[in-house]
Amino acid sequence: EQDLRRTIAIVGTRRISPYGRQITRLLATDLAAAGLTVVSGLALGVDGVAHRAALDAGGRTIAVFGTGIDINYPSQHRGLAREITESGAVVTEFPPGTELAPENFPERNRIISRLSMATLVTEAPLKSGALITASLVNHQGRDVLAVPGDVFFVLSAGCNGLIRDGAVMARNS
């Protein structure tokens, strides 16, 4: 049985910057090496970097699909999904054959939020599914952490806003 006290969701933008890639890799590596299971959505950007870093650190990770288990989205992460099943899990609430649909992502985000003791947003613009996940986590009474970024950079606006609104500032693991 999964011990939720030892899980952390790592979420953020699909259009990751070099800074976002670096900080996501650093934090996911350190958290996985410390024994936490990393939970994310297997999307391009932050999700994929977090999963890869957790695996490379010898840790466990859980990928939550917004499609049926038999639908590889994004197709670029087909191999990563296979690797995750060897030391973690791939989960979905959607039946096999369920294709990608925009309305599936809030449901996927809900599952990510429920599987984790806390959620770390490493890079996100103001309009981001990661902020939806952070809002769900807040309503569940769990901790939201966010990485601060350049106040002039659009991909930092979501994280900076979360910190302004009370999220814990994450600078290192």
Regions found by a protein language model. Name each.
Residues 1-173:
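Glycine-biased, small-residue-rich flexible motifs in mid-sequence functional cores and linkers
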